Amino acid sequence: MRMMVAGGGTGGHVFPGIALAEEVVTRHPANDVVFVGTARGLEASVVPAAGFPIELIEVKGLKGKGLVGALLNLLLLPRAFLQSWRILRRWRPDVVVGVGGYASGPVVLTAWAMRIPTAVQEQNAIAGLTNRLLGRVVKAAFTAFPEAARHFAPRKVYQLGNPIRRRLMENYMRPESAHGAPRLLVFGGSQGAHALNMRVIEALPHLADLRERIQITHQTGARDREYVEKGYRACGFTPDVREFIDDMSAAYAGCDLVVCRAGATTLAELTVCKKPSILVPFPAAADNHQVKNARSLVDAGAAVMIEERDLTGEVLAREIRDILDAPERRERMARAAGRLGSPQAAKEIADVCMELVRRRWGSPFGQAREPGQKPARPPDLAS
């Protein structure tokens, strides 16, 4: 089976696509996956680093661009559809999965017109504009939150969760080693780390009596690292401060409480590794979807949510203290998070995709082609 994964822009779209691709290629040596995205998106660097080929099209978003910006970006669509058609003709995928982001629109629509089975994977509680539009033509809509189902026809919805990359999953499932002092993990994700960094430093004076009894790992991003380190030192704390955490699975395994944003991929990781959390949704997220994402964990008893407009150092310190000082509450929150986890999401989504392929092509392996056959890239593909 050959799968094409279209879309990207941010890690929240790209990483679930990579997780699905990893599941597909490990199932059978003849399976392969190709991605389609844009040169400006995170996928342009992350996908090749993960070992998958990627094709690039030229397309820009319409939402939030203003009238003139939207009209200018609309002019790119005919070219994007032509590029998508060329890519689909060359790669001959058996199924195309859109993972959100504006790059997925032309590819999935062109695949639908070519009678190739199509699906979308929606990571958030509120479906993005592109996925909402594509939902009218695709065969399946894979969702992670019950709230997202309302954007798609009921017969198309498969609520299976967000896929998590295989290497991370293997580490999450390792038994934890025993430890003593409570451990706190803080990170802001790819967007919106600054405000969270500032409020954590403001919280430290209110946690001064815990500085000898708490271990902190804090991912700051490049902009704030020096300021955050100085803030910790001024209050007598000795944390592990990093610009970027390379191995998030180890960071999760080594903590008792997480303070973070409420992106869909982050929440999928928190639930699979069963970690209590204090969630501060990114207020600029499209359609305020991070608040809706966070609410699903809060309602289940797995997390506490503080909206950024209400976030102060004192409020954050109080929530951290209340949870770290209550081992039984942490355990209840951990169990609640685990009940929301979807460790089999990638496998189950791949199962449905293979069934779509079987229905269309008469075999779960798709169209007849030479084993391992991949098209050569023409020099004018992006032109």
Curated annotation (Swiss-Prot):
UniProt binding sites for UDP-N-acetyl-alpha-D-glucosamine: 10-12, 124, 165, 190, 245, 290
Reactions catalysed, as given in the entry: di-trans,octa-cis-undecaprenyl diphospho-N-acetyl-alpha-D-muramoyl-L-alanyl-D-glutamyl-meso-2,6-diaminopimeloyl-D-alanyl-D-alanine + UDP-N-acetyl-alpha-D-glucosamine = di-trans,octa-cis-undecaprenyl diphospho-[N-acetyl-alpha-D-glucosaminyl-(1->4)]-N-acetyl-alpha-D-muramoyl-L-alanyl-D-glutamyl-meso-2,6-diaminopimeloyl-D-alanyl-D-alanine + UDP + H(+)
EC id: 2.4.1.227
Keywords for this protein: Cell cycle, Cell division, Cell inner membrane, Cell membrane, Cell shape, Cell wall biogenesis/degradation, Glycosyltransferase, Membrane, Peptidoglycan synthesis, Transferase
Record's bilayer topology term: Peripheral membrane protein
UniProt key word Disulfide bond: no
Location of region: Disordered: 364-383
Subcellular location field: Cell inner membrane
Disulfide bond entries: none
Pathway listed: Cell wall biogenesis; peptidoglycan biosynthesis
GO molecular function: UDP-N-acetyl-D-glucosamine:N-acetylmuramoyl-L-alanyl-D-glutamyl-meso-2,6-diaminopimelyl-D-alanyl-D-alanine-diphosphoundecaprenol 4-beta-N-acetylglucosaminlytransferase activity; undecaprenyldiphospho-muramoylpentapeptide beta-N-acetylglucosaminyltransferase activity
Gene Ontology CC: one annotated term: plasma membrane
UniProt family annotation: Belongs to the glycosyltransferase 28 family. MurG subfamily.
Function: Cell wall formation. Catalyzes the transfer of a GlcNAc subunit on undecaprenyl-pyrophosphoryl-MurNAc-pentapeptide (lipid intermediate I) to form undecaprenyl-pyrophosphoryl-MurNAc-(pentapeptide)GlcNAc (lipid intermediate II).
Database matches in PANTHER family: GLYCOSYLTRANSFERASE, UDP-N-ACETYLGLUCOSAMINE--N-ACETYLMURAMYL-(PENTAPEPTIDE) PYROPHOSPHORYL-UNDECAPRENOL N-ACETYLGLUCOSAMINE TRANSFERASE 1
Protein's name in the database: UDP-N-acetylglucosamine--N-acetylmuramyl-(pentapeptide) pyrophosphoryl-undecaprenol N-acetylglucosamine transferase
